[in-house]
């Protein structure tokens, strides 16, 4: 049992109120002006924000098969440090969770080693990236969170349509990395001014937006919940906005780096700036910010994609796609958008908690009496510099190295257990 003393919580109007929070048996038992108990442990939250633990539906944990990049343990330690209490792990592992047996083995490993809640995706196709569909029903029974071939787009419309019909019958979501392989052209960055300046092959906007346009029509026909991963282009935002207006059940996420950076920020041919989707144009970034504010884009997800140093500290042509994000998500977004008065604190917290929970019908993301005690304590005055040497993640690959941010998680409770406190994993 814990009593979080002298903290602040956000009320429904987005105003800060001074409150104590009592955690008992893994639940939020009481939220009150003052709580006095004779047993349990007192946690000093003076001057700090007590918020729901963050939810990230797009995380690469790499295990099994990629343990040199990340493990379930190190990835969930990174999540705890970043204030995330629920993360959803992508299936581009070896082996791929494309069968009941592999999924059950993965669930057992998660139960054994994870510091926070991990909800694993199953792949849409066998081995991921093929045209043979998995056994959707068996994988749901084995505990799959949803279905995705993240890392590649499902290339054939017929394959995607059949997948959507099967997912809809089970009331499960299809989560899509949207990329038409015939439009990538071997690109490593956005097809724009940086690619032209550096003489690099570019990935055009239409590689993403064309597949989203196809898929929203398939989702409408199948009656499926279709979720767009890491949306990055103005055309994609337009397609999703129009689909929502038409009543199609489509949701979308955006990554912090696509909100903060664009291609003009890239300093040179450095693999640590290579990600998929790539950093787009200023106009694309503006469209993403507008789409998030008007509800076209539903929430924020990091697309935490750790790699070994030798896979990133090379030119873009040789580097792996992806950057880490779990340990920097909140500080970056708070510094760039809340401190600058572009967003309210409540908007940011909602996009990292209740919004993803609502989209995927998760019973998390709220701080209220009776809720699961997934809690992050945030010091909104704490100033620190992003230093990959301090990361719990094995991946140190971030373009934000050396950036000073204000507002950091200082403690994380997962189902009432203190898993991170003042720089230490418990």
Curated annotation (Swiss-Prot):
PROSITE patterns reported in the protein's UniProt record: DIHYDROOROTASE_1, DIHYDROOROTASE_2
EC identifiers of the protein: 3.5.2.3
GO terms under cellular component: cytoplasm
Recorded name of the encoding gene: pyrC
Active site: 303
Binding site for Zn(2+) 1: 58, 60, 150, 303
Cofactor dependence: Zn(2+)
Cofactor note: Binds 2 Zn(2+) ions per subunit.
Residues that hold Zn(2+) 2 according to the record: 150, 177, 230
A GO biological process held by the record: 'de novo' UMP biosynthetic process
Function, as annotated: Catalyzes the reversible cyclization of carbamoyl aspartate to dihydroorotate.
A Pfam entry, by short name: Amidohydro_1
Chain positions recorded as substrate binding sites: 60-62, 92, 276, 307, 321-322
Family the entry assigns: Belongs to the metallo-dependent hydrolases superfamily. DHOase family. Class I DHOase subfamily.
Covalent S-S links between cysteines: none
GO molecular function, one term: dihydroorotase activity
InterPro entries: Amidohydro-rel (IPR006680), DHOase (IPR004722), DHOase/Allantoinase_Hydrolase (IPR050138), Dihydroorotase_CS (IPR002195), Metal-dep_hydrolase_composite (IPR011059), Metal_Hydrolase (IPR032466)
Pathway given in the UniProt record: Pyrimidine metabolism; UMP biosynthesis via de novo pathway; (S)-dihydroorotate from bicarbonate: step 3/3
Organism superkingdom: Bacteria
Keyword Transport: no
Matching PANTHER family: ALLANTOINASE
Entry protein name: Dihydroorotase
CDD domains: DHOase_IIa (cd01317)
Reaction(s) the record says it catalyses: (S)-dihydroorotate + H2O = N-carbamoyl-L-aspartate + H(+)
UniProtKB keywords: Hydrolase, Metal-binding, Pyrimidine biosynthesis, Zinc
């Amino acid at each position: 049992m814990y009593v979080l003393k002298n903290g602040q919580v956000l009320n429904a109007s987005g105003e800060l109120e001074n409150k104590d929070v009592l955690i008992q048996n893994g639940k939020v038992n009481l939220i009150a002006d003052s709580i006095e108990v004779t047993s349990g442990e007192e946690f000093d939250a003076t001057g700090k924000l007590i918020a729901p633990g963050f939810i990230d539906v797009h995380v690469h944990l790499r295990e099994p098969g990629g343990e040199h990049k990340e493990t379930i343990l190190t990835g969930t330690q990174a999540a705890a440090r970043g204030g995330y209490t629920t993360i959803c792990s992508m299936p581009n592992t070896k082996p791929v969770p494309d069968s009941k047996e592999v999924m059950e083995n993965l669930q057992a490993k998660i139960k054994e080693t994870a510091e926070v809640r991990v909800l694993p995706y199953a792949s849409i196709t066998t081995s991921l990236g093929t045209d043979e569909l998995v056994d959707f029903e068996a994988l749901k029974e084995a505990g799959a969170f949803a279905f995705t071939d993240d890392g590649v787009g499902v290339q054939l419309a017929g394959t995607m349509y059949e997948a959507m019909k099967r997912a809809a019958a089970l009331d499960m979501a299809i989560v899509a990395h949207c990329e038409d392989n015939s439009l990538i052209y071997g690109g490593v960055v956005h097809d724009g001014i940086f690619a032209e300046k550096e003489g690099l092959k570019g990935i055009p906007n239409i590689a993403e937006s064309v597949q989203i346009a196809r898929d929203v029509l398939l989702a409408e026909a199948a009656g499926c919940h279709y979720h767009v991963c890491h949306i990055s282009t103005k055309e994609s935002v337009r397609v999703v906005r129009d689909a929502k207006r038409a009543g199609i059940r489509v949701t979308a996420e955006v990554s912090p780096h696509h909100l903060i950076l664009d291609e003009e920020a890239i300093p040179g041919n450095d693999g640590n700036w290579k990600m998929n989707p790539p950093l787009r144009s200023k106009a694309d970034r503006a469209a993403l910010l507008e789409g998030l504010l008007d509800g076209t884009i539903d929430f924020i997800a990091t697309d935490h994609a750790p790699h070994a140093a030798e896979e990133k500290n090379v030119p873009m042509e040789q580097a792996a796609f992806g950057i880490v994000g779990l340990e920097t998500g909140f500080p970056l977004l708070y510094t760039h958008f809340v401190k600058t008065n572009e967003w309210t604190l409540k908007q940011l917290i909602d996009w990292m908690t209740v919004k993803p929970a609502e989209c995927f019908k998760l019973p998390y993301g709220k701080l209220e009496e009776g809720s699961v005690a997934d809690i992050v304590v945030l010091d909104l005055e704490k100033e620190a510099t992003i230093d990959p040497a301090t990361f719990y993640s094995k991946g140190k690959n971030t373009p934000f190295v050396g950036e000073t941010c204000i507002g950091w998680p200082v403690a994380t409770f997962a189902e009432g257990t203190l898993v991170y406190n003042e720089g230490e994993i418990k």
